[in-house]
Amino acid sequence: MSRAIIFDVDGTLSETEETHRRAFNRAFEQAGLAWRWDQALYERLLAVTGGKERIRYFIDDFDAAGVPPGDVDAFIRSLHAAKTIAYTDMVSGGEVELRPGIRELISDAQSRGFRLAIATTTTPANVDALLGVTLGGCDAFEVICAGDSVAHKKPAPDVYELALEKLQLDAAACVALEDSRNGLLSSVAAGIPTVVTPGIYTRGQDFSEAALVIDDLAAQDFSAIYALTAPAA
């Protein structure tokens, strides 16, 4: 009988959103842009998932000045690539760590025979950097679905549906771990029972569709999480 836990990354495995915000600002500065995303603005921008999509949203909805004439899509791709380099440099420099309880959950779940997977909108490079620094690599995770591996990012269910396909499991045999409403809507739309551990940018969001909301994962024995999965035949 096979069961799996599917993890989001940013805000779930680690409070990385603040590091992402600073990496965006570093990329903007390197590009000679006067843009600066403070915490209040970034919280608003997090309504959109995906870094390139977030930059596009900022340009279109916040009247961002300084966009060069020509191919805006190419400009956004270049800017996002610079941001990814800045982010991975920060992570490699030890500026992030796992959220309390995550390391213990991964270890305990593995000891109980759970399969582990990742479903995230962040880039594979970002996932590799984070897991390399915090866990010594990606070996704990059998399946990693990241970045542009699907056409539609969260809150669409695509990335979770891809993870289920690669795991060859029904949604009922899995539980998802998320930190945001967009992530919750994505996993629930894929039919997966979902545990939410709110992060610094997502506390106060509506998590009414969650099977379980846990403010302090480190204070749990994880049995309530495991109980949400139905063993597959």
Task: Tell me the role of every PLM-derived stretch.
Residues 2, 107, 123-233:
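Asp-based, Mg2+/Mn2+-dependent phosphohydrolase catalytic module
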Residues 2-9, 13-100, 107, 111-112:
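N-terminal helical cap/lid subdomain that shapes the substrate entry/recognition surface
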Residues 38-40, 69, 119, 174, ...:
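Residue-level detector of family-conserved "landmark" positions at structurally sensitive sites
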Residues 12, 120-122:
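Conserved phosphate-coupling serine/threonine residues in phosphotransfer and NTP-handling enzymes
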Residues 70, 74, 78, 93-100, ...:
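Residues at secondary-structure transition points
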